[in-house]
């Protein structure tokens, strides 16, 4: 706003007032207005900035008026440009800007615009000043040319100087003109003094005979001036893009250079005779012209590399390349600059690169190990004591040296150890191609590589290195680790190294402690058979051993994975822990036998290797937050993607939600239950009588799935169960069902039992026809469809849903409901709407919470769920 007012004041002609007075005047007007906003955020820096912009604007106004009122030139349109700028600058309407300004941002924008116009004014002033300076330089050049003596050669020189100025720019032209004027004045004074001396000395000049010789050099110098003129024209054509003219001038330059390269002999006598007594002034001009052309020629030649193309390479050495190719020696980088091919420097370089100079290096190259050199010449970080790569490099070097010594043995029966390097060196010594000092170096190198340790030790190191690179550590078989010695070894006591007092372990496993063999197992090993037993806290340190030595040995020798974790029973957490052994059945038995030999029952009666199966729920006071079984529910009136997992009828089925985050864990749960219940046959069965709603594990073929009891038949001792993850019902013998562990209940039940809304069978009964069943299966089996919950049944309280599928009728795909498709096919009819109630959100939550909250019976070892 301040800047707009400043522009208004400048446009009104407020040039006489100073910027500070103008600013105070504008701010006073601003405070008097009620519609405009106050500049509360304007600090000292902003005030200085506004004052500076007002001062620039004041100067810009004066400059615009001056440029608008300046004399019009016929050569260019400076006056029109200034008038255009002044009209744009004063086109701002301050009153309109003040009326439209409603924020500080708009005021800042006007300040920026004012600064931009000021910068544009400076640019216009600079261009005008530059053009005027160029016109002044042209006038000065005309005055200088008029002041010189008018001769034919002088006019040619002036035209050539003008062309040089055009080619090199105004700056180079000014330098040349100033040099020419100063030199001419000095030459006039010197020539007047030398004329008198030359006239006295040359009493008998022979002008008629020697004058043609004196004219020859002047003609050649004139040719040089013409050459300068052609070069300047060439640069002008290059700037304009005329390639044809440039090529013609280049051909002309080659011819003139060939002429100029010829030797020109100028005698002193011809120069002396060139100055006669009668026409002293006339003969002075060619001499002046020659000196001027020499100066201009030197100046132009300095600029030649910039005007012409890139220079050609200085020198090449074809003979050197031929020698390298014939001798098959790797080429060295050629020098970038060389003075002469026959110079001493080039000869020395060629001699150094000859094949004879590489005789010693070729010999040493055969005994040079590049890989070992790189390892030895590694960085300081790799060779530092704290670097983990240091020990690996030392082992790698020893392995490489051992392999080399093993391959270099010539005759091992006689006990003569002769490496390959010494054998090759002796051959070269016989031929006489290596000097004595060089042989001494190779001998020292071979002595350094001789082994200090036996080959057996190196081989052991080699095996240890390979074992370190494996996924898990392996213990090397030795007589100390034989089974017989292990069985005969004494059991640990209080004075043993593996006793609890001497062990570094505290005896309490606060978290899961596994053997190192666990890292090398794959994901398939997670579903191997598992065996768990109790360990007293007093024996945990003995089983683990010093730094895990005992548990590591048991795991590696029996190929199992051992895990020590906290006990699951609250009353035994402080006294016992659980040891878990995972592997194949034979491997688990082998591990338990070795553990029993190590800890015999006579000395360690508290160690009981009997299996421990944790109860599902110890008592009714158990915290159910971490192991509470839950059901997946459907959102109300919202479509979601589902898959039909089990079909009872066309209107009664089970669905799964494959997009739920927990659905991916179902496959792992099935594999885990198959490995757990398939290998162990001594797991507890369901009690008699079996209560309804108990969670259990039910076998189907070779797999085990989670199920819940629905009805128990006393006569046949059978149980009717419902599978909670895949849906469906089945009648099974009670002896086949097993109690379920608490850790298997953390995953929510994946299947949801639903009914199809709005339809019923055609005959009015509850039995659907085979055609309706086939049609329903064809629409949903193996597909992901959309589902929306619309209510629940009055009788069974089962959720009722609408299923949607995509049908392609022509080009457009439409979404249709299953019930409409069945009715259009004549396989179903409309159901009674009174049997379905649309539930609200609180009622749905209450029903679902009642369905998923488990209840407990008097049988404390099972979970009862109301279905």
From Swiss-Prot:
UniProt topology in membrane: Single-pass membrane protein
Residue ranges of domain KH in the record: 528-595
Ranges of biased composition (kind: Basic and acidic residues): 186-211, 218-239, 247-275, 298-307, 363-383, 441-458, 481-490
Biased composition (Polar residues): 152-162, 336-345, 494-507
Ranges of biased composition (kind: Basic residues): 397-408
Region (Disordered): 145-458, 481-523
Source organism, top-level taxon: Eukaryota
Keyword field: Membrane, RNA-binding, Transmembrane, Transmembrane helix
Domain named Tudor: residues: 689-747
Entries under Pfam families matching the protein: KH_1, TUDOR
Location relative to the cell: Membrane
Transmembrane segment boundaries: 108-128
A GO MF label: RNA binding
Gene Ontology CC: membrane; mitochondrion
Designated name of the protein: KH domain-containing protein akap-1
Source species taxonomy: Eukaryota, Metazoa, Ecdysozoa, Nematoda, Chromadorea
């Amino acid at each position: 706003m301040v800047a707009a007012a400043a522009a208004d004041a400048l446009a009104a002609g407020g040039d006489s007032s100073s910027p500070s007075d103008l600013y105070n005047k504008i701010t006073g007007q601003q405070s008097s207005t009620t519609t405009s906003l106050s500049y509360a955020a304007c600090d000292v820096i902003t005030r200085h900035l506004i004052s500076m912009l007002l001062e620039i604007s004041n100067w810009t106004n004066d400059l615009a008026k001056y440029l608008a009122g300046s004399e019009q030139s016929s050569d260019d349109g400076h006056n029109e440009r200034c008038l255009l700028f002044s009209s744009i600058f004063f086109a701002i309407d301050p009153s309109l800007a003040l009326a439209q300004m409603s924020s500080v941002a708009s005021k800042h924008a006007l300040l920026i615009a004012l600064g931009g116009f000021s910068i544009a004014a400076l640019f216009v002033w600079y261009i005008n000043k530059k053009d005027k300076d160029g016109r002044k330089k042209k006038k000065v050049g005309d005055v200088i040319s008029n002041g010189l003596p008018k001769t034919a050669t002088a006019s040619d020189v002036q035209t050539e100087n003008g062309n040089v100025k055009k080619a090199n720019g105004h700056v180079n032209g000014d330098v040349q003109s100033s040099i020419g004027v100063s030199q001419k004045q000095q030459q006039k004074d010197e020539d007047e003094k030398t004329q008198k001396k030359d006239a006295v000395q040359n009493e008998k000049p022979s002008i008629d005979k020697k004058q043609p010789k004196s004219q020859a050099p002047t003609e050649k110098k004139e040719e040089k001036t013409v050459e300068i003129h052609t070069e300047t024209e060439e640069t002008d054509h290059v700037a304009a893009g005329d390639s044809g003219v440039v090529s013609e001038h280049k051909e002309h330059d080659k011819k003139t250079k060939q002429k100029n390269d010829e030797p020109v002999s100028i005698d002193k006598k011809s120069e002396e005779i060139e100055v006669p007594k009668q026409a002293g002034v006339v003969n002075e001009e060619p001499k002046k012209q020659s000196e001027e052309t020499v100066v201009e020629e030197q100046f132009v030649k300095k600029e030649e590399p910039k005007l012409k193309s890139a220079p050609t390479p200085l020198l090449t050495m074809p003979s050197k390349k031929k020698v390298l190719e014939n001798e098959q020696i790797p080429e060295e980088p050629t020098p970038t600059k060389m003075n002469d091919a026959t110079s001493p420097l080039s000869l020395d370089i060629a001699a150094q690169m000859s094949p004879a100079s590489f005789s010693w290096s070729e010999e040493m190259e055969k005994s040079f190990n590049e890989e070992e050199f790189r390892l030895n010449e590694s960085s300081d970080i790799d060779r530092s004591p704290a670097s983990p790569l240091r020990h690996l490099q030392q082992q790698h070097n020893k392995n490489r040296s051992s392999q080399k010594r093993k391959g270099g043995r010539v005759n091992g029966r006689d006990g003569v150890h002769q490496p390959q390097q010494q054998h090759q060196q002796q051959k070269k010594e016989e031929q006489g191609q290596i000097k004595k000092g060089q042989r001494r170096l190779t001998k020292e190198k071979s002595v350094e590589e001789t082994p200090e340790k036996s080959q057996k030790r190196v081989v052991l190191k080699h095996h240890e290195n390979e074992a370190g690179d494996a996924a898990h550590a392996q213990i090397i078989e030795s007589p100390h680790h034989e089974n017989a010695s292990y069985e005969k070894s004494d059991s640990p006591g209080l004075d043993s190294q593996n006793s609890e007092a001497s062990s570094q372990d505290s005896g309490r496993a606060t978290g899961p402690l596994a053997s190192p063999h666990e890292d090398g197992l794959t994901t398939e090993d997670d579903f191997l058979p598992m065996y768990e037993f109790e360990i007293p806290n007093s024996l945990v340190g003995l089983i683990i051993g010093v730094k895990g030595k005992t548990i590591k040995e048991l795991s590696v020798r029996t190929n199992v994975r051992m895990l020590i974790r906290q006990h699951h029973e609250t009353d035994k957490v402080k006294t016992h822990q659980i040891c878990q052994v995972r592997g194949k059945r034979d491997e688990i038995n082998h591990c338990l036998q070795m553990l029993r030999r190590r800890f015999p029952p006579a000395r360690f009666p508290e160690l009981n290797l009997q299996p421990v199966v944790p109860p599902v729920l110890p008592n009714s006071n158990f915290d159910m937050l971490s192991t509470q079984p839950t059901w997946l529910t459907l959102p109300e009136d919202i479509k979601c993607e589902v898959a039909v997992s089990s079909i009872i009828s066309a209107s009664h089925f089970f669905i799964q939600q494959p997009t739920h985050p927990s659905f991916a864990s179902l496959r792992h749960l099935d594999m885990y239950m198959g490995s757990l219940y398939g290998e162990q046959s001594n797991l507890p069965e369901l009690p008699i009588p079996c209560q309804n709603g108990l969670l259990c594990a039910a076998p189907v073929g070779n797999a085990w799935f989670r199920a819940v009891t629905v009805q128990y038949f006393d006569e046949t001792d059978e149980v009717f169960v419902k599978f909670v993850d895949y849906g469906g019902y089945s009648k099974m013998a009670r002896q086949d069902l097993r109690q379920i562990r608490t850790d298997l209940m953390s995953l929510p039940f994946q299947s949801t039992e639903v009914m199809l809304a709005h339809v019923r069978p055609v005959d009015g009964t509850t039995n659907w026809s085979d055609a309706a069943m086939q049609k329903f299966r064809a629409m949903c089996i193996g597909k992901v469809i959309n589902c929306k919950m619309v209510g629940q049944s009055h009788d069974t309280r089962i959720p009722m849903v609408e299923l949607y599928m995509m049908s392609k009728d022509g080009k457009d795909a439409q979404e249709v409901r299953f019930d409409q498709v069945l009715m259009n096919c004549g396989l179903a009819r409309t159901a009674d709407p009174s049997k379905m109630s649309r539930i609200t959100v609180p009622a749905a939550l209450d029903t679902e919470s009642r369905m998923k909250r488990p209840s407990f019976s008097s049988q404390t070892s099972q979970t009862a769920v109301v279905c």
